[in-house]
């Protein structure tokens, strides 16, 4: 069995815990790879075990950090590796255990006492090409000029769903429903469901409300005059500028995010995390 280790790069405690996990697994006789960016911030790992995240080929990834660390893994890895998230971040909605539970969790993982939680992702096509990472949380199409609204139409399966003047629009997965989409007035969505939430950001018309559509849908977003540049953000991690005539289509991705879980509990766990964090 081979493990990969990825840590939050700007928190010393996360890097030190990553080394303890690395040492524990090596002493236990397992092959371990370490993300190069983790190594660059704590060069105590054996250099022969260090590879870029894009080249990981492992059975499990141990992520020591927050949601941003997990999103970095999801954007850079080429396969859907199961991730055990250890919360060393601010929110930690995607993580499974707290730091003091790390080695108990590893023991359960090694004993096979876990299950895999699969989450849908969305895929974005710009002018027909899949040139950006799949989103685990959301795509946000934003005004490219601060202080200026954008005028957009969005279609679901070819039918006009809404026309908005707003700061932009969010297309979210159930996993992302506790993030940016929630701030835009979207609902909390049970992560076991597969669907899209479409949420306009600060729309002028009060009648423009978030909507929920099936995950089988194709969503097309069409900019309207006055023509201004747009910014596409994927999970708040990837950014690209779009010209006003860019064709934007969003579908369910064939890929999944996969998480190691020890509990099947959804309620009250997720609502409690929302209240606790905010």
Curated annotation (Swiss-Prot):
Q: Name the source's superkingdom.
A: Archaea
Which residues are annotated as active site? 67
- UniProt GO molecular function: ATP binding; metal ion binding; NAD+ kinase activity
Q: Could you confirm whether the keyword Cytoplasm appears in this record?
A: yes
**What cofactor(s) does the depicted protein rely on?**
a divalent metal cation
Predominant location: cytoplasm
Enumerate the subcellular locations listed in this protein's record, separating them with semicolons: Cytoplasm
For the keyword Cell inner membrane, the answer is no
**EC number(s) per entry:** 2.7.1.23
Q: Which GO terms describe its biological process?
A: NAD metabolic process; NADP biosynthetic process
InterPro entries per the UniProt record, alphabetical: ATP-NAD_kinase_N, ATP-NAD_kinase_PpnK-typ_C, NAD/diacylglycerol_kinase_sf, NADK
Q: Which reaction does it catalyse?
A: NAD(+) + ATP = ADP + NADP(+) + H(+)
- Function, as annotated: Involved in the regulation of the intracellular balance of NAD and NADP, and is a key enzyme in the biosynthesis of NADP. Catalyzes specifically the phosphorylation on 2'-hydroxyl of the adenosine moiety of NAD to yield NADP.
- What protein name applies here? NAD kinase
Its taxonomic path starts at:
Archaea, Methanobacteriati, Methanobacteriota, Thermococci, Thermococcales
Identify the coding gene.
nadK
